[in-house]
C-alpha cells in the first residue's frame, strides 16, 4: 500500500509543478533554463505527452488486472483491481478536465479582439 501512496505523492508533486509553471513561477531547473518560447513549448508538449502516456498506461494496467482477476489468477485480488480501476478513472477524469480548460482558454484567446 505504501507504493500507492508514494505514487499519489509523485502525481501530486507533478500537478503542483505544472500549476507553478502555468502561473509563471519556476518549479524546476528545466523550466528556469527554458528561456525561449520554443523551448517552453517543447517542455509543455513533452509534459502533456508524458501525462497522456501515464493515463494510458494506468488504464492498460487496470484492464490487465481486471482480465487477470476474471480468469482467476491467484495473485490478483478484487481490492487491487478496484483500486487500479479507480486510479485509472481519476487519471482519465483529470486529463479530461485539463483538456476542457485548454479548449476553453484557446476559445477565449481566439475571441479576443486585436
Swiss-Prot record:
Keywords: Bacterial flagellum. Pfam families: FliE. GO terms for biological process: bacterial-type flagellum-dependent cell motility. It is found in: Bacterial flagellum basal body. Belongs to the FliE family. PANTHER family: FLAGELLAR HOOK-BASAL BODY COMPLEX PROTEIN FLIE, PTHR34653. It comes from Burkholderia lata (strain ATCC 17760 / DSM 23089 / LMG 22485 / NCIMB 9086 / R18194 / 383). This is Flagellar hook-basal body complex protein FliE. GO terms for cellular component: bacterial-type flagellum basal body. GO terms for molecular function: cytoskeletal motor activity; structural molecule activity. InterPro entries: FliE (IPR001624). The keyword RNA-binding does not apply. The keyword Signal does not apply.
Amino acid at each position: 500500500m505504501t507504493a500507492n501512496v508514494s505514487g499519489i505523492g509523485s502525481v501530486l508533486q507533478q500537478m503542483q509543478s505544472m500549476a507553478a509553471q502555468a502561473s509563471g513561477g519556476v518549479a524546476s531547473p528545466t523550466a528556469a533554463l527554458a528561456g525561449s518560447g520554443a523551448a517552453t513549448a517543447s517542455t509543455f508538449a513533452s509534459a502533456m505527452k508524458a501525462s497522456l502516456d501515464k493515463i494510458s498506461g494506468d488504464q492498460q494496467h487496470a484492464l490487465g488486472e481486471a482480465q487477470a482477476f476474471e480468469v482467476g489468477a491467484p495473485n490478483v485480488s478484487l481490492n487491487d483491481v478496484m483500486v487500479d480501476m479507480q486510479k485509472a478513472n481519476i487519471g482519465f477524469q483529470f486529463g479530461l478536465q485539463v483538456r476542457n480548460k485548454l479548449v476553453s482558454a484557446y476559445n477565449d484567446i481566439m475571441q479576443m479582439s486585436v
